[in-house]
Each structure stands twice: as C-alpha cells, then as structure tokens.
UniProtKB/Swiss-Prot annotation:
UniProt cross-references to Pfam families, sorted A to Z: LamB_YcsF
GO biological process: carbohydrate metabolic process
Family annotation (InterPro entries): Glyco_hydro/deAcase_b/a-brl, LamB/YcsF/PxpA-like
UniProt catalytic activity: 5-oxo-L-proline + ATP + 2 H2O = L-glutamate + ADP + phosphate + H(+)
Name of the featured protein: 5-oxoprolinase subunit A
EC number: 3.5.2.9
SUBUNIT field: Forms a complex composed of PxpA, PxpB and PxpC.
Species assigned in the record: Rhodopseudomonas palustris (strain BisB18)
GO molecular function, one term: 5-oxoprolinase (ATP-hydrolyzing) activity
C-alpha cells in the first residue's frame, strides 16, 4: 500500500492570541511542525502542542523562522550572515528539544518557516546555513525540503536525511516554486479541489502548475497549513480522499 505523511504547521499562537485549531489538526496530521518563538509560539504554547502531538501519536519537528512576530515570519530579513542564520536556527531547534523533553516527546525533523524557507529556496548561503545548523544540532534530524530547491541541494550536501515536501493548499509556478502569497490564487481554499489534487500528487508524483504544467516531484510529505481558513475541513477531506484511493497516512519519521 502507498503511504504518505501529512504535515501541518502548528503552535503558531502567542500568549493569549491563538492561531488555528491545533487540537483538531493534530487528529488529522501524521507530523506537525511547531513554531519555536521567533515568528510565533512561546514556551507554554510549545509545550501544549508537543503534549497534544504525543497523545495523538504524531511526530514533531521544529519550525524555525526569522525573528519577526509582527510579520509572522513572512517578511525577509536582509543582511544576516551565515553565522547569524545558523544561530537563529540552532537556537529554535534547541528550544523545542528542551520543551519536548518536558512532555516526554522527541523532535524528529526540521522545516524552515515562511520567508526563511522562501529565501533559502533561492539563496545558497541561507540554505547551507540552515542545513549546517541542523547537522550541528543533530545529524539524524530529518530536513523537510521543498522539491527541486536549493534547500534540497543543501541538505544533500550536508548529508542530512531528507523528506521532500509538496503543498496541498499552495499554487505552483512552472519552475516548481510557490506562487507568491501577494498574488491572487496563491492559496487554495476549496476542500474538494485540494483533496483531489493531493491524491494526484501522491499517485502521479507530480504537481500541476498554475498554467497546467505537470511538474514531477518526489513526494514524502504533504503540507496543509493550519492557519488557512477552513484548514480542518481541508485536512479532513484530504484524509478521506487518500483513504478512498487506498493510500495510507503515516509519519515519514516512522512514528
């Protein structure tokens, strides 16, 4: 039976401010990426999210981003050196590892967030710095990378275990990059459309661009953003469609 991982970005509230329905999304995901305090999240939210994931048998990963709470980590931060990027990534991974130990759970993977990921997909220095930080913290951590990107090449060069990611609810350009969130249609919202799209991604090993071009991509994990309106309904629809197609859902990290 074909198996695929479903991952969600969670723990992205801050203090009294909540983002998304983490408890519901954890019931539908097999892996979650937890904000580590820079673009969102705090120690209490991190621990609560880890506890929910452990109770649900869901793998957890660090979701490091630029230090930009106001912009939710979706704005590039210019002028950072490779060492500064390594520091901010290692800092955030370590924070989640420490909090996870309180809940008796283990961090299995790392996925860069927002603008940090977007920049790294096109900039070798940023991509290599992220990979170097992960390797320095724990060379066994799985590096979640966007297919056909510089992040992928950096992870390969560093010798890290990799999980190739595609996005259920994001549109793709013909060059396999994500359509900018500033453009209309960048984020998809129709649960039925997204569910059918994910099944095709897994079965065909390809995504369809905004112009209708089929782009071959290895697919180890499919991301559904927890902050997308209707995220729970989207995730539920994807799970149901995968089941109907005979595709099992399981963590890429092996549980």
């Amino acid at each position: 039976m074909t198996t695929i991982d479903l991952n969600c970005d969670l723990g992205e509230g801050f203090g009294a401010w909540q983002m998304g329905n983490d408890a519901a999304m954890i019931e539908l995901a097999s892996s979650v990426n937890i904000a580590c305090g820079f673009h969102a999240g705090d120690a209490d939210i991190m621990r609560n999210t880890v506890a929910l994931a452990k109770a649900g048998g869901v793998s957890i990963g660090a979701h490091p981003g630029y230090r930009d709470l106001h912009g939710f980590g979706r704005r590039p931060v210019a002028g950072l050196s490779a060492a500064e990027i390594e520091n901010l990534v290692a800092y955030q991974i370590g924070a989640l590892q420490a909090v996870a130990s309180l809940a008796g759970h283990k961090v299995t993977h790392v996925k860069a967030h927002g603008a940090l990921s977007n920049v790294a997909c096109e900039d070798d220095m940023t991509a290599n710095a992220i990979a170097a930080a992960i390797k320095a913290v724990d060379r066994n951590l799985i590096f979640v990378v966007l297919a056909n990107s510089r992040l992928l090449k950096a992870g390969e060069a560093a010798g890290l275990p990799l999980a190739h990611e595609v996005f259920a609810d994001r549109a793709y350009e013909d060059d396999a990059t994500l359509v900018s969130r500033k453009k209309p249609g960048a984020v998809l919202h129709d649960p039925a459309q997204i569910a059918a799209r994910v099944v095709r991604m897994v079965q065909d090993g390809a995504v369809v661009s905004v112009t209708g071009k089929a782009i071959k991509m290895r697919t180890d994990t499919v991301c559904i953003h927890g902050d997308t309106p209707g995220a729970v309904e989207i995730a539920r629809g994807v799970r149901q469609a995968l089941k109907a197609a005979g595709i099992a859902v399981a963590p890429f990290a092996g549980g």
